[in-house]
Every structure is written in C-alpha cells, then in structure tokens.
From Swiss-Prot:
Class of the enzyme per the UniProt entry, highest EC level: hydrolase
Protein name per its UniProtKB record: dTTP/UTP pyrophosphatase
PANTHER family: BIFUNCTIONAL DTTP/UTP PYROPHOSPHATASE/METHYLTRANSFERASE PROTEIN-RELATED, BIFUNCTIONAL DTTP_UTP PYROPHOSPHATASE_METHYLTRANSFERASE PROTEIN-RELATED
GO molecular function annotation: dTTP diphosphatase activity; UTP diphosphatase activity
Active-site residues from the entry: D73 (proton acceptor)
One Pfam family matching this protein: Maf
Compartments (UniProt record): Cytoplasm
Protein source organism: Vibrio parahaemolyticus serotype O3:K6 (strain RIMD 2210633)
Family note: Belongs to the Maf family. YhdE subfamily.
A GO biological-process term: nucleotide metabolic process
Catalytic activity: dTTP + H2O = dTMP + diphosphate + H(+); UTP + H2O = UMP + diphosphate + H(+)
Function in brief: Nucleoside triphosphate pyrophosphatase that hydrolyzes dTTP and UTP. May have a dual role in cell division arrest and in preventing the incorporation of modified nucleotides into cellular nucleic acids.
Length: 189
C-alpha cells in the first residue's frame, strides 16, 4: 500500500473487522453514525449500495486526511422484502419462518472511497434453508445470535446449521466478500 494512504474500516462489526484482517491489510476503525432507513420505492440492491456508500463517506469525514475508507452493508432478501436486523423475538420468528425451507438472497455491498475517487460493488449470494421447527427458532433466539444479524441469522455461527446450500460468496453472507473487497482496495494502490 502507498505510504501516503491509510485504510480505514467504517464499521463496528467484529465480523467485518476479522474478514478485512484476513486480507492482510493494516487498518484503523471509525464508527460512522448514519440513518439506516429504506426508502419506500428503493430496491434492495440500491438500498444496500446506498448504505455502504453513506457509511464509507461518513467514515471519510471522521478519518485522517488521505485515508481510504471502506464501508459495507448486508441485507437478506426474501420474496422481494428486505430483512434487516430483528427488533424483537417476534420479528426474528417472522423472518426465520419466512426463510424456513426456502431460498433467499443475501446482498452485501462494499464501497471504498477517498477524497478523489470511489468504487463500489454489490455481491448477491443465494442461500437455502432447511425447514425450521418453532422449537429450533425459539432455541436459536435464546442463544442471542440472531439479535444483530440481517435476516436474523449468522451463517458463521449456530445459524449455519440451518443452511443446506449456498451459491455465491460465503464471506459476503458473513459480511464482507473477500475477493471483491480486495479488488476494490487495489484500485487505490
């Protein structure tokens, strides 16, 4: 990496921090505060892309001059509905019931910005769930894992036992597609 540039992750997600570290980059972390609200007619892909870009741009305002800032967001889409982080057990139960025994999409957007340029990508992965019982959903909620996850599950944790198949990027489902993220960062080197 050029010595004049410093990489900054605009996220408090421990999963994104761990995944970015896997790419071998040194980076700092800033915690941008943006409103995550879907506009009424906004398509899922446009929404997740907008959020990743807003996070990166807000992070750029918090970072040192000459920083390169990475923002990312993930949503789960089922029947053209965006499933974000659950607000309650009832919300989580509804999401997991909707995903039960079906295919859905996980969309992760990554935006990398500097004061001179910006590059973004959206990675969509198809995920299939086994049929879930009410008991499995209740036990999973009790584990605490679904609380901070889009779609109310984490493929890298206990929620992985619900997944029968994926087509696409496993790392994108976790929160940061490694290949695509590295390609974006390379644009700034």
């Amino acid at each position: 990496m050029k010595k004049s540039l410093s990489l900054v992750l605009a996220s408090g997600s421990p999963r994104r921090k761990e995944l970015l570290a896997q790419l071998g980059y040194d980076f700092d972390i800033v915690l941008p505060d943006i409103e995550e609200a879907k506009q009424a007619d906004e398509q899922a892909q446009d929404y997740v892309l907008r959020l990743s870009l807003e996070k990166a741009q807000a992070g750029l305002a918090l970072a040192k001059p000459d920083s390169v800032v990475l923002g990312s967001d993930t949503v789960v889409v089922c029947d053209d509905r965006v499933l974000e982080k659950p607000k309650s057990f009832e919300d989580s139960k509804r999401m997991l019931t909707d995903l039960s025994g079906r295919r859905h999409q996980v969309m992760t957007a990554v935006s990398v910005v500097s004061s001179e340029q910006q590059h973004s990508v959206v990675v969509t992965t198809d995920v299939w769930f086994k049929p879930l019982t009410h008991e499995e959903i209740e036990q999973y909620w009790q584990s605490g894992e679904p609380c901070d996850k889009a779609g109310s599950y984490g493929i890298q944790g206990l929620g992985g036992r619900f997944v029968t198949r994926i087509e696409g990027s496993y790392h994108a489902v976790v929160g940061l597609p490694l290949f695509e993220t590295d390609q974006l960062i390379q644009e700034f080197l």
